[in-house]
C-alpha cells in the first residue's frame, strides 16, 4: 500500500489518496481484457499442440495492445505491469470484493476458494478465528502454491532448450540451476536462474543473445542484455511457456547460496511457509524485482532468517509454530520498528544487527550509502540489498499488511460481516485468474491426469476382461459356496475374534485411499482403484493343480471333533500357531505356512459376506495369482 503523494515502482502515478487497489468495476483493471498470451492461444488450439515446439508459430501478442486497453485512463501511462506480471493485482480493491460463485474479473478463481470469495483458491474450508485460523490458512496457501510435478517438468524442458543452445556454442560449458527453482521455493510465475561456467576472456553475453534469437527459444522482444549490472545477465522469456529466465556467467555464489538456503530451511521448518507468502505478497505488488528497486528472493530470505534468529520466541525452530503469529510479527518488525537508515542485517554467527556507517566503509565496491543493507553470509564484503532502492516502498507495504492482519485476528473481528467465510490471508494476498488459468494449462500439457490408467487386478496385471464379466463369474460359484455354507455357520462364533487378527488376502473395499495398506500378505503392486477389487470372485483358491477343497474337508473334520471343547479363548490361542503367507512377487507364493493343526484363515469380503479359507501346512498361491481362466471357470 503506497501512501499519499508517493509513486509505486515502474513510474505509475499515484493520486493523493491511496489507490494501490481500486474497485473491480473500474476500467483500470485489464487483467481479462488484453489478448491471450502465447500459451493460452496454443491451449485453445487443442490437445494436439506439441508441448515442446521447435519454433513457435507466433510471438506473444500482449506486447501490442490497443491503445484504449494498454493505457491507464487515470494516470495516462502504459499499464505494462499487467502484461509482464500475471500475478499483479494492481487495480483491485480487496475490501470491495463481493461474494461470488464464479470467476471475478481479474480476481482469480472463486470456485477453488470454497465458492465464496474470488482470488483465494487455497481456501477450501472455513477456518477458526484469530491467529489459529490464519495459521491454518497459511498452511493451505503453502500447499496450494507449492510447485507441482508438472510445473517442475515444464521448467526442466525450458532449461533443456536453453542448455542445448549453449552446448552448441560451447560444448565444454557447464550449465547449472540456482535460485528458487533449485531450492523449490518458487511461485508458478517465478523465473529460472541459470549460470554458465566456462573459460572466456570477455563474457559472451551478446553471442548467446544472438544464438537464442536465432533458435527462437525466446520471444524476439524479451531478450535483454544487462551488461552494466553488478552481475551481468541475459534476461529472456521462453517463447512457448512464457517462463522468465535469467542467465549469468561464472557466478559461484549463486549455487552456494542455494545450498545455504536449504541448510536454513532444515534449521527453521517455518521458513518455506513464510517465504512463499512473502514472495507472493511482493510479487503481486511488483516489489520483487531488484532491477526496479524491489527486494529480491535472496534478500527476502535473509530478512526472514534474521527475523527468526533474533526472534524472542523460543519456539521459532519448532515445526508446529503458529505461522500466523510469525507472519504478523515479521510485518511489524520490517514495517514499523526496523530502522533502514542506520541498521544493517547480519546472518553470520547466529545473526545480529550492525551499524551501517561502520560496515559500509569496508565494502568491496567502496563506501556507498545503501537503503537496505544485508550482509552476504557467503561473502561478508558484499551488500546483497544495495540495489533495492525502493526499500521504503516495501516498508510501507509491510506496514499496511501488519495493520490489516492485526485487525483481522483481533477479538472484535468476530463481529465483522462474513467473518466466518472471509479469508484472513486474502485481505493482503490474492491469486489472479490469469495465474490460475496458467497453472491449469500447465497441468493439461505436462500433467498425468489426462493419461488413462488401465484397469488392473491386485497384482498390477492389466485386465483384458470387463469388470462386469468378472462379476458374472461370482454367480457361477454358487454351488461351491453352498458346499461351505454349513461349516461357515458352525464356525461363525469362534471366527469372529480369530478373523480380526488373522492375515487377510484381498484388500478391504472400505478404504478407497489406502488400497494397499490392508493387504499384509502381498508385496505385489496394489490395485489403484477399489472398484476393480470388488470384481474378484471369492472362489476356492488352487495350489498348483491341487484344489484347496481337499484341505477344507480335513480341516472341517478336525474342527467338528473339537467344536464342543473350543471356546473363544481357545480360538484366540490357536492364532499363535497359525502362520502368515508371504509373497515376494506376483509369480506365486514363496513362503511356507507351518501349523500344528488345521488353521482357519478368514478374509474380508467386498460383497458383505464373510468367506473362509482353509490350508494345512502346504504351499499355496494367493488367490490374486489365480489365472483369469480359473476365476471364470
From Swiss-Prot:
Q: Where is this cross-link: Glycyl lysine isopeptide (Lys-Gly) (interchain with G-Cter in SUMO2)?
A: 531, 558, 573, 587
Give start-end ranges for motif Basic, involved in binding of the RNA primer. 618-624
Residues given in the record as ATP binding sites: 254, 279, 297-298, 382, 386
Q: What are the start and end residues of every segment in region (Disordered)?
A: 1-115, 484-633
Q: What is its EC number?
A: 2.7.7.19, 2.7.7.-
Residues where Phosphoserine occurs? 545
Q: How does the record describe its quaternary structure?
A: Component of a nucleolar TRAMP-like complex, an ATP-dependent exosome regulatory complex consisting of a helicase (MTREX), an oligadenylate polymerase (TENT4B or TENT4A), and a substrate specific RNA-binding factor (ZCCHC7 or ZCCHC8). Several TRAMP-like complexes exist with specific compositions and are associated with nuclear, or nucleolar RNA exosomes.
Q: Would you tell me the protein name for this molecule?
A: Terminal nucleotidyltransferase 4B
Report the source organism: Mus musculus
Q: What is the lineage of its organism?
A: Eukaryota, Metazoa, Chordata, Craniata, Vertebrata
Gene name of the encoded protein: Tent4b
Amino acid at each position: 500500500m503506497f501512501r499519499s503523494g508517493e509513486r509505486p515502482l515502474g513510474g505509475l502515478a499515484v493520486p493523493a489518496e491511496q489507490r494501490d487497489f481500486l474497485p473491480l468495476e473500474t476500467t483500470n483493471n485489464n487483467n481479462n481484457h488484453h489478448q491471450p498470451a502465447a500459451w493460452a492461444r496454443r491451449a485453445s488450439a487443442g490437445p494436439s499442440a506439441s508441448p515442446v515446439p521447435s519454433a513457435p508459430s507466433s510471438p506473444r501478442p500482449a506486447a501490442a495492445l490497443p491503445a484504449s486497453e494498454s493505457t491507464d485512463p487515470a494516470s495516462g501511462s502504459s499499464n505494462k505491469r499487467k502484461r509482464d506480471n500475471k500475478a499483479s493485482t494492481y487495480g483491485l480493491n480487496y475490501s470491495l470484493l463481493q461474494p461470488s460463485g464464479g470467476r471475478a474479473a481479474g480476481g482469480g478463481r472463486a470456485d477453488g476458494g470454497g465458492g465464496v470469495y474470488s482470488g483465494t483458491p487455497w481456501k477450501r474450508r472455513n477456518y477458526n478465528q484469530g491467529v489459529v485460523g490464519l495459521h491454518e490458512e497459511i498452511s493451505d496457501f503453502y500447499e496450494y502454491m507449492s510447485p507441482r510435478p508438472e510445473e517442475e517438468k515444464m521448467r526442466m524442458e525450458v532449461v533443456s532448450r536453453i542448455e542445448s543452445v549453449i552446448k552448441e556454442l560451447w560444448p565444454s560449458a557447464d550449465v547449472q540451476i540456482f535460485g528458487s527453482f533449485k531450492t523449490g521455493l518458487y511461485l508458478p510465475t517465478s523465473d529460472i536462474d541459470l549460470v554458465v561456467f566456462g573459460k572466456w576472456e570477455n563474457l559472451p553475453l551478446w553471442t548467446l543473445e544472438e544464438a537464442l534469437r536465432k533458435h527462437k527459444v525466446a520471444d524476439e522482444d524479451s531478450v535483454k542484455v544487462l551488461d552494466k549490472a553488478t552481475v551481468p545477465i541475459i534476461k529472456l522469456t521462453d517463447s512457448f511457456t512464457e517462463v522468465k529466465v535469467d542467465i549469468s556467467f561464472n557466478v559461484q555464489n549463486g549455487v552456494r547460496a542455494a545450498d545455504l538456503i536449504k541448510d536454513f530451511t532444515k534449521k527453521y521448518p517455518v521458513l518455506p511457509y513464510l517465504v512463499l507468502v512473502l514472495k507472493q505478497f511482493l510479487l503481486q505488488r511488483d516489489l520483487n524485482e531488484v532491477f526496479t528497486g524491489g527486494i529480491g528472493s535472496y534478500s527476502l530470505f535473509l530478512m526472514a532468517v534474521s527475523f527468526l534468529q533474533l526472534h524472542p520466541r523460543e519456539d521459532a525452530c519448532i515445526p508446529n509454530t503458529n505461522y500466523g503469529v510469525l507472519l504478523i510479527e515479521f510485518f511489524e518488525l520490517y514495517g514499523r520498528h526496523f530502522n533502514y537508515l542506520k541498521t544493517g542485517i547480519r546472518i553470520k554467527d547466529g545473526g545480529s544487527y550492525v551499524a551501517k556507517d561502520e560496515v559500509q566503509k569496508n565494502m568491496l565496491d567502496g563506501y556507498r550509502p545503501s537503503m537496505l543493507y544485508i550482509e552476504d553470509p557467503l561473502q561478508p564484503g558484499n551488500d546483497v540489498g544495495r540495489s533495492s532502492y525502493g526499500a521504503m516502498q516495501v516498508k510501507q507495504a509491510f506496514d499496511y499488511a501488519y495493520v490489516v492482519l492485526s485487525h483481522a485476528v483481533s477479538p472484535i473481528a468476530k463481529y465483522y460481516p462474513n467473518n466466518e467465510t472471509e479469508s484472513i490471508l486474502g485481505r493482503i494476498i490474492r491469486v489472479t485468474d490469469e495465474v490460475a488459468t496458467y497453472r491449469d494449462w500447465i497441468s493439461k500439457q505436462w500433467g498425468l491426469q489426462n493419461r488413462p490408467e488401465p484397469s488392473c487386478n491386485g497384482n498390477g496385471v492389466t485386465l483384458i476382461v470387463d469388470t462386469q464379466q468378472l462379476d458374472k463369474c461370482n454367480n457361477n460359484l454358487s454351488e461351491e459356496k453352498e458346499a461351505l455354507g454349513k461349516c461357515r455357520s458352525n464356525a461363525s462364533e469362534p471366527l469372529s475374534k480369530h478373523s480380526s487378527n488373522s492375515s487377510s488376502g484381498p484388500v478391504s473395499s472400505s478404504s478407497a485411499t489406502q488400497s494397499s495398506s490392508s493387504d499384509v500378505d502381498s508385496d505385489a503392486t496394489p490395485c489403484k482403484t477399489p472398484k476393480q477389487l470388488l470384481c474378484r470372485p471369492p472362489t476356492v483358491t488352487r495350489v498348483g493343480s491341487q484344489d484347496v477343497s481337499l484341505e477344507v474337508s480335513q480341516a472341517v473334520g478336525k474342527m467338528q471333533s473339537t467344536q464342543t471343547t473350543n471356546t473363544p479363548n481357545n480360538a484366540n490361542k490357536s492364532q499363535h500357531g497359525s502362520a502368515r503367507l508371504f509373497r515376494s512377487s506376483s509369480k506365486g507364493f514363496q513362503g511356507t505356512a507351518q501349523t500344528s493343526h488345521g488353521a482357519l484363515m478368514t478374509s474380508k469380503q467386498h460383497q458383505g459376506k464373510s468367506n473362509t479359507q482353509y490350508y494345512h501346512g502346504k504351499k499355496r498361491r494367493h488367490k490374486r495369482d489365480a489365472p483369469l481362466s480359473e476365476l471364470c471357470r
